Amino acid sequence: MKQITTWLAAGIFFLAILAGEQATAQKKRTTGSGFSAATRPRNLSDSALLDLVQKQTFRYFWDFAHPVSGLARERSNNSFSYGDEVVTTGGTGFGVMAVIVASERKWITRDSAARFLLKMVKFLSKADSYHGVFPHWLNGATGKTIPFSRKDDGADLVETSYLFQGLLCAAQYFDADNDTETSLRNRIGWLWNEIEWNWFTRDGREVLYWHWSPNNGWAMNHPIRGYNECLITYVLAAAAGDRYGVSPAVYHGGWAQSDNFKNGKDFYGIPLPLGFDYGGPLFFSHYSFLGLDPSGLKDRYADYWEQNRNQTLINREHCVRNPGHFKGYGPNCWGLTARDRKSTRLNSSH
């Protein structure tokens, strides 16, 4: 435990300083002062360490939110030269979840949380969207699309799924009979009801497509197939109802039809029902399950509790055995996923 405390404390220290410095520089709300080397907590219990990680995660989305829209920044503006205005729709969905947690744990008042999210939703109602689907990046001041790449300058169905995974949870959590929470629920409902999931089957094909743009059409040509972090996109598309929802055939004929969908092999003696050999990055077990409970969730392909548990156990065992002899890997330092490195933007950890 001592080793994991050291590794996590170092990560928390960096994130806390980042959140504190960015919040100060942007002159936005804060939930308290940032960390310093002199005052950072030491010798924390597991429970206290977990509390600290959770609170510092929330602070990124609260202290460093865009001052106009409230949406989440795309990583660090200073480190990655994105400029002051780039916000991310999918990351905002994660931030909505963090705000709900902060309200429940009394780090902020329920009313301030609801008002913060209402500002977000009002902004989104005027921002660019395409058949109800938002782009990956928006300008946080104007709501205009910022291209993610040359041809990716329109709708992003997967990022929109992450956004609404958070917003739908907010609509359930903020259930009070007052003007702020009623308006929040109604506005989330209006946005949700305008998402044309079935339009992204590209004229009725049995698969969902990730991107579409008015400038480039379907040029990205990226069908969403499993198994990866995109399960929630199909779940929400199926849940959308008769107007814009998709049929089970789209799930079975699209998502489940891939060379990397079924696995069935054992790794380190642990069976893996779905996905790439060794399971792939751990965010496959995270992103879709922020709002989707895997407990008891089964279909003809997998028990999703078993899938997530076993992928995680394989990930840990790989670090314990450390066949690549990477420095630091071991029983108290594991959890391989995507991460940032300043020199090359985004990398997958080994």
Stretch-by-stretch model annotation:
Residues M1-S33:
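Bacterial Sec-dependent N-terminal signal peptides
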Residues A25-S348:
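Ser/Thr/Asn(+Pro)-rich, low-complexity disordered segments
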